[in-house]
Structures are given as structure tokens and as C-alpha cells.
Amino acid sequence: MAAPEPSRPGTIRVVIADAGPLIGLARIGCLDLLRALFGGVTITAVVAAEIGIDAEPDVCADRRPGASAIAKARAAGWLSIVESTAVPDVEPLNPGVDSGERTTISLALHWQAAGAQVLVIVDDRCGRAEARSRGLPIIGTAALLVVAKQQQLIPACAPLMAALREEGYYLSDGLVAAVLAEVDEA
């Protein structure tokens, strides 16, 4: 899929995700929160490869945890894949940025320059710092859960954060405490 161009500045909201948040949410059965919150999400082909899904709508390249649910989201049409070659590559300022984060940030910058309102879903510290340094708005998995609770899409954050941790998804004690305090679950 080629990168679409917005017709008027500020009229298109594009949500672009890195692999980590998608995998984490898929592994705890909450991937559909992204559809409920944003309607649709875009990933780059590099991120799709990291996850283990193919460009074909219902093909799961392997059996990595969460890959099947993410492939189903692609087949349902609310998760789209953009070829990484469809946008100019941006050299990261931070050497810790991986290829998925790099292409996610490149795509977000491309669409932002074309006038779209973008939001980047990323959890990795280096990826978040890189996106922030380039003026991109970001949100992480923990904040997504806060928004989902505020919009009454989930009854509580604590069990989902615990499930993420049980699946090996890193959430610092400080982050968990801050989120639970924010949603009155401390």
C-alpha cells in the first residue's frame, strides 16, 4: 500500500504503531481497543515483519505470540500496512532506535509534513525519545489503557497491566503505580 496523501492540512488523523504495543495488546486479548479508540491503525512493512505477519490480509507468517490476532485485524481492514519504501527514510538521532521504530517515525514525519495529524504508538524508550525529539505526538500502551478506561471501554487497568507483565511485557513499577493512581485503582 502506498502512503496516502492528505487532501487538506490537519484533516486526517493517522495513527501509526510500532510492533511492541500491538504485540502486547494482542497477547492479552485487547488488540481491539485500538480499533475502538482510533478506528484504524497503520504499521510499516518492517513492523509487520517484526510481528510475523505477511502483507496478505489473512496470512500469519509464523506463530509468534500475538501475530495471529494482528493478522486478523489486518484481514478485518482496520490495520493497514504501508510499504516502508513508500516514504523517505529518516536517519535516527538515537543509535538505539530499531528498524521498526525508524520506519514508524519516518512514516509519521512524512504524513505530518503532508498536513496530517499523526499519533505514534510506541513504548520503547529510545523510540519514544526519537519521536519526541522530532516533535511527534506519542502514546504508549499504559496510556492507551488509561484512555480506554476513561472512555469506559474497559472496567479497570490493573488486571490488564498485570496480564501484560505476566506475558513478559516490560512496564516499570513507577509507570504501573502512576497509571493506577491516575485511574483511581491505587
Task: Give each language-model segment a name.
Residues A2-L119, R125, R134-L136, G174, ...:
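Active-site-proximal, substrate-binding regions of enzyme catalytic domains
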Residues A2, Q117, R128-A186:
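Acidic, PIN/NYN-like endoribonuclease modules and their adjacent C-terminal/linker elements
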